[in-house]
Amino acid sequence: MAKDDVIEVEGKVIDTMPNAMFTVELENGHQILATVSGKIRKNYIRILAGDRVTVEMSPYDLTRGRITYRFK
C-alpha cells in the first residue's frame, strides 16, 4: 500500500484484545479494529485503554486500521 492511499485519523482506544489488537473509537464516532504498527511494537511502546492514538486506514477496508502514534 502506497503512503498516498492511506487515510490518517485520530481516535481513542476503547478496549484491548489479544494479539495486540485494539478497538479504537474514531473522532467521527465509528469504531474500528486496529493493530499496532511495526515501529511501535519494536520500541515496546505500551498502548492502554483511554490512550489517544493516530490510526492509518486503507480506503479499501474502513473497518480495520494500523496504530502509528500514541499521544503523550
From Swiss-Prot:
Main location: cytoplasm
Source organism, top-level taxon: Bacteria
Entry-linked Pfam families: eIF-1a
Residue ranges occupied by any S1-like domain in the UniProt entry: 1-72
GO cellular component entries: cytosol
MF (Gene Ontology): ribosome binding; rRNA binding; translation initiation factor activity
Keywords: Cytoplasm, Initiation factor, Protein biosynthesis, RNA-binding, rRNA-binding
Cellular localization per UniProt: Cytoplasm
Record-linked PROSITE patterns: S1_IF1_TYPE
UniProt keyword annotation of Cell cycle present: no
SUPFAM superfamilies found in the cross-reference section: Nucleic acid-binding proteins
Family (UniProt): Belongs to the IF-1 family.
Quaternary organization: Component of the 30S ribosomal translation pre-initiation complex which assembles on the 30S ribosome in the order IF-2 and IF-3, IF-1 and N-formylmethionyl-tRNA(fMet); mRNA recruitment can occur at any time during PIC assembly.
Function: One of the essential components for the initiation of protein synthesis. Stabilizes the binding of IF-2 and IF-3 on the 30S subunit to which N-formylmethionyl-tRNA(fMet) subsequently binds. Helps modulate mRNA selection, yielding the 30S pre-initiation complex (PIC). Upon addition of the 50S ribosomal subunit IF-1, IF-2 and IF-3 are released leaving the mature 70S translation initiation complex.
Record-given protein name: Translation initiation factor IF-1
Encoding gene (name): infA
